Amino acid sequence: MSIGFLRQALNALQQQSRSRTSHRVNQWFKWLSPGLSIKRWLLISVGGVLLAILGLAIWVKLTPIFWLLELVRGFLGAVANILPNYISGPLVILGGLLLLLWGQTRTVGSITQVLRPGAEEELIDVLLAHRRLYRGPKIVVIGGGTGLSTLLRGLKTYSANITAIVTVADDGGSSGRLRQEFGVLPPGDIRNCLAALADEEKLLTELFQYRFRAGDGLTGHSFGNLFLTAMSDITGDLERAVAASSKVLAVRGQVLPATLSDVRLWAELADGRRIEGESSIPKAGGKIVKIGCIPANPPALPAAIKAIKEADYIIIGPGSLYTSLIPNLLVSDIADAIAQSQAPRIYVCNVMTQPGETQGYTVADHIRAIDAACGERQLFDAVLVHKKSPSAQSLIRYAQQDSHPVFLDREAVSQLGRRIVLANVLYEDKTGFVRHNPQKLAKVLLKWYGGAHHGK
């Protein structure tokens, strides 16, 4: 074995040791970060130790303390002869503080090992993230379908004060079957939002989204839908079922149904037909001229109205225009609360038109449809539009389904009194499937909120 090899090994060990030491010291000093409410308790602990020493001194009539002080005095005198007091003093103080901090962190670490076994993150990092997220803005997001859950995955990294208000008009697929067989409100969109906001382990979220592929009566159902249906029966209604499920998944924020009424959508088409049922409307293949619900003006969930009134920021969309977004706004109390809000409000327009709902629609057409459904009230101040067109591969794929990019007609949008926010927020996979990128979308929305909020 050569001397050079040994030297390299020793250098590698030294670098690794320095790296570990630096990381540990960095983790210790994180406990002194502002906003954690740690430093005050640390100072109280130090005060308690000093007070206990003083009490002990009084109890033993101070005699041993004098001996100890004389010993310390002699030691300090010897140190002062070697190092000046302006150097030795701060060094001793720093050493004492490091020992105290090290002892505190090791104590907390021992407790954490029991409470959070196998956790990959350091407790201090969890605390810092928790403080940052729970100091984030109160954001209300309104919509449904995959568009809403995509946005929530991005927003939850900026704030834990998120309220997702979700449509309950779905009557297709697993949700529709459960609605028909058990008389429960459709849980599908709520399940997707809970999974998107979940802060629990990935395996638990995957379990919630698991869809059965076989089994008499189980095929097509997702575990989360069945879980929410069972919880609704146990707790008495969907609102309490969602609250209980949120605890299981450690959800950041809350998910609320727009209403607890059994809502059924209807649409009038340009050819005079009237189509009933959320899943039947896109299949009808006509131009939608009017949309409503049975019963008309269903009562809003009080918690949803409260969240809107307290919101710092309101986001509408993305999602299917007529079957995910507008059904929430047909609950007149929700539309009223949004209209009266002084918070910054923005609409996230879809990237592509949707067959059976918005063929040929421009950005302005989307805005007009929302305004018409809400009695021509202006529920948002700006519209977020994707800047670039998808790839040729995606355009060909979507054209086969009669779906095309939503055209931005700037002048028409400006005439409707809306500001335009242009940004690259698209995600495109290898097969040409496009959707909003959760992280990019959330970043752009929070940046616009910062400008709108400070501009007030």
From Swiss-Prot:
Matches recorded under CDD domains: YvcK_like
Record keyword Cytoplasm present: yes
Assigned keywords, A-Z: Cytoplasm
GO biological processes: regulation of cell shape
Cited function: Required for morphogenesis under gluconeogenic growth conditions.
GO annotation, cellular component aspect: cytoplasm
InterPro entries, per database record: CofD, CofD-like_dom_sf, Gluconeogen_factor
GO molecular function, one term: LPPG:FO 2-phospho-L-lactate transferase activity
Compartment annotation: Cytoplasm
Pfam families in the record: CofD
Protein name: Putative gluconeogenesis factor
Highest taxon of source: Bacteria
Source organism of this protein record: Nostoc sp. (strain PCC 7120 / SAG 25.82 / UTEX 2576)
Chief location of this protein within or outside the cell: cytoplasm
Similarity section: Belongs to the gluconeogenesis factor family.
